[in-house]
Amino acid sequence: MFKLLFILITSILIPNQFRNMPVDLVQPNEEVISCFLSGDEFYQRVHDNNNYTIIQSPEDGYYYYATKNETKIVPTSFKAFSVNPKEKGIAPGIKLPKTQYLKLRDNYHRDMEVRDAPSIGIINNINVFIRFSDENEFVTSRNIYDEPFNKEEGPSMQHYFKEVSYNLLDVITHHYPQCDFETNLSYQDQYDRNYYKPYNENTNPEGYQNDNQARIREHTLLKNAMEYIADEIPEDLDIDSNDDGYVDNVTFLVSGSPTGWSDLLWPHRWALYSFDVYINNSRVYDYNLNLDQGGYFTVGTLCHEFFHSLGAPDLYHYYDDVAPTAVGGWDVMDASSDIPQSMSAYMKYQYTDWITSLPEIEFGGTYQINPLSSNENNIYRINSPVSDTEYFVVEYRVKEGIYEINTPGDDNGLLVYRINT
């Protein structure tokens, strides 16, 4: 327990964005260029190790350094890694304008029905393995893939949510198609991987050409995968724990890793709203799509995406240079490592039933607060003296255990952050 003395609060303490993920791209002349990929489910960009943006030309299929032409990102005349971009006057860090990014995000959520999985009880998560027509079967055994989901002693998604929920939520993942855990088995789609990548006249003429086409292709893929394994799911397995008519959650583990700009094959949470797909009379709707390679299949990614299914939003800023870091490494919904830290106390209070009250400190004095890992007396609210729409939340973070040991810095201490209502 920590004792704190409040006299005056005037300061504010300060993603699951992927950043600098290695990716190899192949030029039309078969030259391999080693780049990096950064972004989230709404928008991704390719860049070099100095953050110079790289884009594929729609005319010849080569990758070039990028520049901005009014509101569009366009290729320069310089192929990637053929020149020093700084010497050519190319600006680093070119990315989609914020207004266009927000439009992509809004369109992504536009047709989704707002619903969240229950945050208390047992959720039997259905996980489906998927590969494409031009790919061989998964070679890694099922038991290796099972550990990030179900490893009893952690780290795993099941162990994480048991701990952060104070044993109120148990997420048990069941894998399909069924097979011996010493082997592996997947649904194989009728289309190859390029069918699910962006269109390019020269290098990928079968790719999707707009967001609507990408949505239909993704949802058709997942619909077919669910129908392929539907008969294997036992009727007595409770996949709708709150009896709302929807499967609580489904995850898809897709072979491979993202390969470039605007790739729909990127870890994300979405809803299968384009089709009516049912398992044992419950509709398949909310899902998390994950990739099995390239550093994208981690406990941190699984927990971030599943917390979306409980209703939690992303906390990171798309433009790091226009606003302070939201909460950074103090919350799994902003930034986390392969083994995630907890979400903040406020996120537990706002989006789950794990913290059910937010006591207010109205007067100066001495107050006691427990670490966030404790299930009681772990959060306070202090109203802003200058705003009716803002208040501060206080919590106590201790570097301990498997997850909280990954919080920033080397010490235990109070975390104070502002909530703008």
What are the residue ranges of the model-derived segments?
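Short, solvent-exposed loop/turn elements at domain surfaces
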Residues: 33-34, 43-47, 74-75, 134-141, ...
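Sec-dependent N-terminal signal peptides
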Residues: 2-13
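Ordered hydrophobic segments in well-structured contexts
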Residues: 22-24, 34-36, 43-45, 53-56, ...
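N-terminal prosegments of processed precursors
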Residues: 14-115, 358-362, 385
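Extracytoplasmic
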Residues: 18-20, 122, 411
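Extracellular hydrolytic enzyme modules, especially secreted metalloproteases
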Residues: 249-251, 255-409, 420
